[in-house]
Amino acid sequence: MNIETIKSVYFVGAGGIGMSALVRYFLFKGKVVAGYDRTPTPLTETLIAEGAQIHYEENIDLIPETCKDKERTIVVFTPA
């Protein structure tokens, strides 16, 4: 995989301390970043303010269309 060909990154568990660092990294790299977390927190609100699209409902319709492109999107998740 070439990270330069990736357009968007979707995170499951975006509000975790390790995941949020990756969210910020990909935002810095200019990628479309979106994700899901169970509850809003000051950290997820900060990520939204920095440009991430985060939702708190388990609803596939809330995933941005750009993140549904299998060829140019990576999904990052944690078992935590």
Predicted regions and their residues:
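N-terminal leader/targeting and accessory segments in enzymes
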Residues: 1-80
